[in-house]
Amino acid sequence: MLFKQTFTGFLILALFGCGTDSSQDSTSDNLVQDTKSELVLSEKESVKIKKILTPPVPIKPFKFKQQVKGYTSNFFANPLDGNIFISGSFCELRGNHFHAGMDMRTGGIEGWNVRASADGYVERIKISTRGYGRVLYIRHTNGYTTVYGHLQQFKGAIANYVKERQYKQRKFEIELFPKAGELSLKKGQIIALSGNTGGSGGPHLHFEIRNPSGQSTNPLLHGLMINDKLKPEIKRISIYRRDQNSLHSTGNYPYTTISKWGDQIQKKKPIKLKPGNYSFGVLANDYFTDKKNVLGINYCWLTANDQLVYSYQIHKFNFSQGRYINAHIDPYLKWKEKKIYVRLFKEPFNPLPYYQQKNKGNLTISDGDSVIMRLYIKDYAGMMDSVLWVLHGDKNASELAKPVGGISDEVKQVKNNTRIQFYEWDINVPKKSIYHPFDFKLKIKNVKSGMLSKTLQMHYPYTPLHSYINVSYTVPEKWISYGSKLCAFSMDVSRTYYEGGTLHGNVLKFKTRSLGEYAIGYDELPPTIKPIQVGKSYRFSVKDNLSGVKEFICSIDDKWILAEYEPKTNIISGTIPNWIKPGEYIFKLIVKDNRGNTSKFQRKLIL
C-alpha cells in the first residue's frame, strides 16, 4: 500500500512553530525552516528516520504547491481610509456558507468613508433588511466586480438615484440595475458610508472582488496590503473510521479527537487503531494581529510517511456551491463541540473543486503497521503550523466512539426522493436535498407552550440539509377556523422560530432546510408600535414576537414617504421630505406581520 510502511520503533519529532514568523517560539533546536517552508531535519535525526522508515523503493516526498500566486496587483485600492484590519477572512467557515469576501474593521463605529476601489460604474444596487443590507456592486474596466456590503448610506449621485426609485416604486427594500455607464465612478471616489445593515453582527465593511465569471476571489491575492503578524494554529485532530459499513445510522462516522497539547502529539505517544480504513479532520484557526479575532484556513495538506493523503486550497469559489460547506466540515462535531472541524477527505457527494487526495482520503492500516502522519496549514502571508503524530495498527485497540443518537418512535431510511408519513405529518425529501443516505429518526413529544400540535422531533439538528424538504401537516377540523393565522414553528432549547406555511384545505404546507423540533401554532397578535420621536424626524420601536414584520407604510395625509427599517434594533425611522410644506398633517404608520396581523399609529403633525 502507498501509505503503509511498517517499522518497530517510533521517531520522536517536534514539529510545532514551523512558520516563517521569527517571533514565534520553537519547541525544537533540531528543526530549521528553509525558504520553501519544508521541514528540515538535523543530520542525526535524518539517519534515524532512514533506519526506521525506508521504503523498499524510494518514493519522492510530497511537496505542496500553491496554485495561484496572485492576480494583477495595484489595480484595486483599499476602499477605506487608513490601514486594513480584518475581522473576517475570505472563505472563512460560516453557519451554512463560505464567507465570500473580506470584512474590514471600522473601529466599532459606523460612518467611515467608503471609496471605489478602481474606476468603473455601478452595475447593481440593493437595499435589504437581510444579507448584505445596503450593498453596491461596481463593474471595472478589467471585467472584475467589487462588492461593498452593510453600508449605512449611499453618497452623491448614487444616493439620489436610489431615493428617486424608492419613491417611484414606493418601497424601502429595493434592487436596481443601472445601465452601463449611468453611474460612472473614479478610483478613490466616495460612494457610501460604512454601516451595520442587513445580517451584520457589528459595524464593518464587507468587501469582495469577483472575477468576470462571477466567482468570488480572495482580495489579498490582488495586492491589498494587511498587517499579518501571527501564524495559523492547529488546535485538534479528528480521526474517523471509514470502512464500507462504518457510516453510523445518524449519517456520521465513528471518531475520536486529539488535542495538539496531548501526549499523542506532544510526546508522540502512538495512537492505536484497529485495522481498517481511516480519514482525518482538523480544528485550526488563523489570526492576523490578535488571537481574539479568529479567522479561517485556506491552505492545508496531510501526508502519511511523506506521501500525500489529502490537500485543499481555496482562492475562489462559486456562490451556488456555498452551502456545500456542510460537506467540507464535520456537522456533527460542530453541533457537539461547538467547534468547526474541516474534513481532510472528500465525500462522494461533495462537488467542490478545491481538493487533491489519494485513495479518497483514506489511509489503510493493518495489524502491526505504524505510520507517521504530518499535517500542515498555511496562511496567505506564508506562515505555517504543523503537527506530527504516529498511528499503530493493533487488533486489540478500542473501537472509536459512535455518534450519539437519541430515542425515536420510528426510523426510516432516507435517500433521495423519499416520502415519510408519520401520524399527521408528511415529509418529502427531494433529490439532492441530503448529502448521503441515513436513518431518519422521528418522535412525537408533548405540546409546548403556545403551540397547538404536539412537537415533532424530526431527526437531529446537527444533520444538515442541502436544499429544502417539503413538510405537510393534516390540520384537525377544530383548528381550521384559524385560517391564514395557522403556521409552523421550529424550536431549540431557548427560542422559537417562525417557519411559515400555507393552508390548502385542511393541510398546512411549508418548506425547511433544517432538522429538529417542529410544531403547528398560530399568530393572531399584531405588531406593537411605540413612538420614540414624531416630528420632522421620526423614530418608532416596532416589534413582532412571532411571525415577524413583513411590511410597513409611512404616510403624510396618505401620501407615501420613505422610511427605513432596521430589524436588529426594531427601529423604523425617517425624515419628512422637504417637499412637504409647513402646515398641519396626519402622520400615519401601518405595520403588518407575516400572517397579515396589522397595527396602525396615527397622529396630527404640525410642521
Question: Where are the predicted features?
Answer:
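C-terminal motif of bacterial Sec signal peptides marking the signal peptidase cleavage site
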Residues: 16-17
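Surface-exposed, glycine-biased beta-strand/turn segments
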Residues: 29-145, 152-154, 172-181, 186-187, ...
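Long, low-complexity serine/threonine/glycine- and acidic-rich segments characteristic of extracellular
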Residues: 186, 227, 242-397, 507, ...
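Short, structured interface segments
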Residues: 205-225, 390-392, 503-523
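Low-complexity, Pro/Ser/Thr- and charge-rich linker/hinge segments at domain boundaries
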Residues: 216-239, 246, 310-312, 394-414, ...
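Short coil/turn motif common to extracellular beta-sandwich-like domains
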Residues: 274-279, 464-470, 532-539
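Proteolytic processing hotspots in large secreted/extracellular or virion-associated proteins
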Residues: 399-401, 411, 440-487
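Proteolytic cleavage junctions
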Residues: 404-417, 462-463, 477-485, 489-550, ...
